[in-house]
UniProtKB/Swiss-Prot annotation:
This protein's UniProt keywords: Disulfide bond, Secreted, Sensory transduction, Signal, Taste, Transport
Keyword Transport: yes
Single biological process term from Gene Ontology: sensory perception of taste
Lineage: Eukaryota, Metazoa, Chordata, Craniata, Vertebrata
Annotated localization: Secreted
Annotated source species: Rattus norvegicus
Function: Could play a role in taste reception. Could be necessary for the concentration and delivery of sapid molecules in the gustatory system.
UniProt name for this protein: von Ebner gland protein 2
Description of how the protein assembles with itself and partners: Homodimer.
Pfam family, one: Lipocalin
GO cellular component, one term: extracellular space
Entry's Gene Ontology molecular function annotations: small molecule binding
Length: 177
């Protein structure tokens, strides 16, 4: 369960099998504050344990050269901890790598304004996984964006039954429970 939560927490991502999605613009601006609206992955969620997961907004900053710095706070072992990672820009628009190229992240604009689908695939501890996330500029669920995400999940070969919608939390003070 901890490995699954860590995988979930560390994955910031973008679009299910590039051929299933439109090409992205060269200079898409994903910097700013984003809220996780929904997530789905290729692994079964044990007893839907993530139903009570609370997430805080993530901050994305565009670095020199087009790389992205992603920061967010997660509750790990009962304590709030800040996580940060750098997504390295590739030659392909909307495609990034993380952890020395071991993981690939695609950033795909949703059909709904101010929403993106991040699709992430890679390996952690020799286990391959795929995760898709719907993020938006505000914390409210947008039904049209959720339907777009469900279609993207299906198109990408992930199971729409594995979609879960986390609870939104504005803060998780570092070190707090």
């Amino acid at each position: 369960m901890k490995a699954l939560l860590l995988t979930f927490s560390l994955s910031l991502l973008a679009a299910l099998q590039a051929q299933a999605f439109p090409t992205t613009e060269e200079n898409q601006d994903v910097s700013g504050t984003w809220y996780l609206k929904a997530a789905a992955w290729d692994k079964e969620i044990p007893d839907k344990k993530f139903g009570s997961v609370s997430v805080t907004p993530m901050k994305i900053k565009t670095l020199e050269g087009g790389n992205l710095q992603v920061k967010f706070t997660v509750l790990i072992s009962g304590r709030c901890q800040e996580m940060s990672t750098v997504l390295e820009k590739t030659d392909e628009p909307g495609k990034y790598t993380a952890y020395s190229g071991k993981q690939v992240v695609y950033s795909i604009p949703s059909a709904v304004e101010d929403h993106y689908i991040f699709y992430y695939e890679g390996k952690i501890h020799r286990h391959h996984f795929q995760i898709a996330k719907l993020v938006g500029r505000n914390p409210e669920i947008n039904q049209e964006a959720l339907e777009d995400f469900q279609n993207a999940v299906r198109a990408g070969g992930l199971n729409p039954d594995n979609i879960f919608i986390p609870k939104q939390s504005e803060t998780c003070p570092l070190g707090s429970n």
